[in-house]
């Protein structure tokens, strides 16, 4: 009898099984979650075809450099074939947000839901990315990465696709959704190819036309420092930002700070 020695104690973590996956809250300080697992409403919408989790493998990259993409409007054209017309970032609390629209070489087409690709993309914390997408189809994209050691992560992708007719999915809808998910996966794989080849860049030099990279890096610090410091980092980064020379996505962002 007696207390269990600290060295022999087994730690426990908050675990939820939802959306076809297992989610674990990890806090090295041992604290309870200070934000909830986001609700993916489209998962339960019967007019959407639920996708499958694509495991993309392990990546030798610090997750901070993956999150950089939320501010990297400049890569959308050369990497993904987008012609960005409007773009903005917003940072608030545990969310980092990107809103953008423009043409795209693979995810829009004649007769689709939208002539341009519109994405409303949110990071919920440092590793859960979701995006409402309107292009050839209306869809809901999920990209998750899990750190497994310093500078190494595992990555997953999923896509829910709304039927073009707005009704319950037919067999043809399921086939079309699977094809569209593959197109989405291949578009994301273009980022994966860059990450797998690049050297670490943990202390980069930023210039005004780069966008809100520095704000994104400051936002990210709240997750890799004591929780008590989070408010200090948020004070330095919260707000909406538009890259120099770019048009804001939303009208109320016209007066937003130029990144």
Which residues fall in each region the model found?
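C-terminal catalytic domain of Rieske-type non-heme iron oxygenases
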Residues: 30-259
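Active-site-proximal cofactor/substrate-binding loop regions of enzyme domains
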Residues: 1-22
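Extended catalytic-interface subdomain
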Residues: 19-28, 71
